[in-house]
Amino acid sequence: MPAGAEAKNLPLVVLPHGGPAARDAPGFDWWSQALASRGYAVLQPNFRGSDGFGRTFLEAGHGEWGKKMQTDLSDGVRDLAAKGLIDPERVCIVGASYGGYAALAGATIDTGVYRCAVSVAGPSDLKRMLATNKRERGVGALRYWSRFMGVDGIRDPDLALISPAAMADKTAIPVMLIHGKDDVVVAYEQSTIMADALRAAGKPVELVTLDGEDHWLSRSETRLKMLQSTVAFLEKHNPPTTPSPAAAP
C-alpha cells in the first residue's frame, strides 16, 4: 500500500512472481516498494502452481498457463474492487520471467482487466521456448515444461492458444517489453518476437533492451533503468492520481 494513502479506490499494479514454481512471502521487496512509493497499491498473488503450499497446490497449476493461473490474478483484482480498496478502471500488470508471461497473457488472453502491461524477460512464444529448452537443457526440461503447460510437447497445437505472441491481435492496451540482451534463461528473442507480433497487428508496444544484462538484472544500473522505464510507462498509462474535475462555469 502507498504510505499514508486511504485504502479506497487506489490505482493497482498486479505483480505476479516468476517461476512459476516459486512464491511471494511477507518481507521487503524492492520492486513492490518502488511501485508503492509512486502511489500504487501492489497485489502479489500466490496463484495456483506456486511453490511452498504443498504438492496439490503446486500441481493445480499444471495445464493452467493462460487459464486458471491467469484468472487467479484477475480474480484477485475483482476481490479488491468489490471491497472498495482499488479502482478497477486503474489496474496494470507487471511481472518478470513467468510473471512477464502473465503480464503478456493479461494483455492478450485474459483481456479487459488491465490498462497496461509490462513484461520483463517474459516468454511469449511457448513453442519456441520449449524447443530452446530441449536443445539447450535436454529432454527432461522439455518434459517438465510440457507438463506444467499441459501440452504434449513442441508440436501440440494448443501452444498457440496460450502463447501471447500468437494472440497479439487480441491486445487492446499498451505493452512494454524489457529484456536483458544476455539472458540465457528466457532468450531475448522472446521479447523481440512479441514486439514484432504486436507491431504487425498495429498494437502499441515499447521495447527496452538492457545490453549486457542477464535474466535476473544482476547489475544495479540496469535494474534502476528497468524501474525507471516501468514507472514512466505506468505513470503515462495509469496515473497514480486522478485529475481534478474541471471547475463548473
Mark where each language-model region is.
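Short, Asp-centered acidic motifs that coordinate Mg2+ and/or phosphate
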Residues: 11-12, 41, 116
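Active-site-proximal cap/loop segments of hydrolase catalytic domains
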Residues: 45-249
